[in-house]
């Protein structure tokens, strides 16, 4: 029973996922600090408020807090896209560009048979 669990945990996908979660948590703290401490300070100087939490309050409905969450999400998404996704895509494209093109696949048995039939038909016509 424990041997099967050990095999499951030691598979590459589980280890990669665990590392990704840990790195994602650490990166999330960095991005949250960037948003809350730097970018929202810039928003505060432009708009006059550090966030929108108290802007639109209708009783228990805090629409401003929802708007602040959306702004944070958009900033975090843009930061992740431009700081992680774009460089990884460019690196992947660069490595693909430097790889030799794959060799064409060998003809299948069906293709060989069709080629023989074609050649025989050409011989009968001439």
Swiss-Prot record:
Bilayer-spanning residue ranges: 14-34, 66-86
Annotated compartments: Cell membrane
Membrane topology listed for this record: Multi-pass membrane protein
Keywords attached to this entry: Cell membrane, Ion channel, Ion transport, Membrane, Transmembrane, Transmembrane helix, Transport
Alphabetized GO MF terms: mechanosensitive monoatomic ion channel activity
GO CC annotation: plasma membrane
UniProt-listed InterPro entries: Mechanosensitive_channel_CS (IPR019823), MS_channel (IPR001185), MSC/AndL (IPR037673), MscL_channel (IPR036019)
Superkingdom field: Bacteria
Role, per record: Channel that opens in response to stretch forces in the membrane lipid bilayer. May participate in the regulation of osmotic pressure changes within the cell.
Assembly behavior: Homopentamer.
Family per similarity comment: Belongs to the MscL family.
Protein name per the record: Large-conductance mechanosensitive channel
